[in-house]
Amino acid sequence: MSINDDISSDVMRIRDADWNKRSGSKVPSPGDVTLSNGAVEIDATYLYADMANSSRMAKELDRRVTAKILKSFLASSSRLISHFGGTIMSFDGDRVMGAFMGDAKNSSAIKCSFSIAYSVTQLIRPKFESKYDTVKNAGFKIRHATGVDTGTVFVVRGGIYGSNELISIGRAPNLAAKLSDLREGEYTTFATKSVYDRTNKLQKQRLDGSSDIWEKRDWDFCDENITIYRSSYWRKPGSN
């Protein structure tokens, strides 16, 4: 068969297939979902962490230094997602996506986001600025943003045999990714009202009990005005 026959066959086969869908109580692994027509529907909270200024890093810094910064960000973010009970779903260049399930999924995702903010602002940025003058004197600061949303997600496998991965389809992963693109001053965590309302009290206040860590605002998404909450707060892992 020619390549045109192959892709035409793929499109028709996928279009005409009936989904073999089931509800999931945990985040599926690729082996849990058949490539042909498998799907798992889950209720999950998605976290999307994105390193800012990566294009400027690539332009202004030695590529070996840029690679170290990005690797540090992805390593620490991935470790924190796993630490707080999440599952790493995918990487996309300078971004990582995690999914959290269970009764505490929203609080766990927010705790994770606060700890990612700690790793960037209190570890990665100062440690690289202290070692490399080019980073310290660059026309930008090492920074990031994390978006968090929750909802029902349709998980399928995309790609071809031998080269495929899970794809998360739904508002939660899409909106979390869009929120991670926001660059608003020192704010690092952006969460939807759905997440904020279901997050426990400890993630709405500082360790000393003061409750000024979140700011409510409206945001336009796909022609819809939605309520989001943003925070510049960070918390060292293990503090609470």
Swiss-Prot record:
Q: Catalysed reaction(s)? A: UTP = 3',5'-cyclic UMP + diphosphate
Mind naming one GO cellular-component term on file for this protein? cytoplasm
The places in or outside the cell where this protein is found are:
Cytoplasm
- What's a single GO BP term from this record? defense response to virus
Domain spans labelled Guanylate cyclase: 45-180
Keyword Transmembrane belongs to the record: no
Per UniProt, which keywords does this protein have? Antiviral defense, Cytoplasm, Lyase, Manganese, Metal-binding, Nucleotide-binding
The protein's enzyme class: lyase
- Cofactor names: Mn(2+)
Query: Where along the chain is Mn(2+) 2 bound?
Result: D50, D94
The positions annotated for binding a ribonucleoside 5'-triphosphate are: Y48, R95
Which InterPro entries does this entry report, sorted A to Z? Nucleotide_cyclase (IPR029787)
Q: What does this protein do?
A: Pycsar (pyrimidine cyclase system for antiphage resistance) provides immunity against bacteriophage. The pyrimidine cyclase (PycC) synthesizes cyclic nucleotides in response to infection; these serve as specific second messenger signals. The signals activate the adjacent effector, leading to bacterial cell death and abortive phage infection. A clade B Pycsar system.
Q: How does it assemble?
A: Homodimer.
Name of the protein described by the UniProt record: Uridylate cyclase
Please report the organism this UniProt entry assigns to the protein: Rhodovulum sp. (strain MB263)
